[in-house]
Amino acid sequence: MKIVVSPAKTLDYESKLPTTRGTQPEFLETASKLNRKLSRQSKKELSDLMSISDKLADLNYTRYQEFQEDHNKKNSRPAIYAFNGDVYTGLDSYTIPTDKLDKLQDTLRILSGMYGVLRPLDLIQPYRLEMGSSIGIERKKDLYGVWQKKVTEYLNAEMEDDEFFINLASNEYSKAVDTKKLKGTVISPVFKDFKNGKLKIISFFAKKARGSMARFIIDKDCKTLEDIKGFDYDDYRFSEEYTENENEPVFIR
């Protein structure tokens, strides 16, 4: 079983790490090429490219200038501990027991505009580059062109034909994977909440739930779709009634 999640724009490079382990990203050479192009952009160009404030443009301009091809424990941090958004609140990675790290490293993959795809312990440097950004290299017009073939082939090389591919990434990041060419069966869970008497997807809760489900799969060592349907973190429950497609199981609360 493989799980994919989105990265986060919010980063944490301050908290004490629970492990000294760190691995090298698969596509570091491509990431370095992207950074070289980004480092040539002005602050105004970065602001326009990413639709961010001048303050954030200043921060990321500095990040791209300081980016180093050599990723080590002094200038980088394992991805699972560096990302700090809603998904990672649900995943709660700092509390994952160290004896579960091998399982985590084998099972979870993080899609990334800068690095393509990351294992949890892959070292990354601070960056901001959303997958939907209109910037490309290698004669590609955007990041989907840069990454889709690379990421899909990478994931296929890791998977068996009978494996489940649990898609917990956002639509923006899911498009970086050509799911039609993936081995195995793609499962895309949906999380809905009752609000004002109506069942709907609420973005903040859905993001956190994706992280919680990834944590559940690691904690419970899930191997089958039935195992996944047992997801009950944060009071969610699988709903047969609201599930119209078995590959898109709906969880409600």
Curated annotation (Swiss-Prot):
Top-rank taxon: Bacteria
Pfam families: H2O2_YaaD
GO cellular component terms given for this protein: cytosol
GO biological process, one term: response to hydroperoxide
Signal peptide span: none
NCBIfam families membership: PRK02101.1-3
Similarity-based family: Belongs to the UPF0246 family.
Protein name: UPF0246 protein GFO_2679
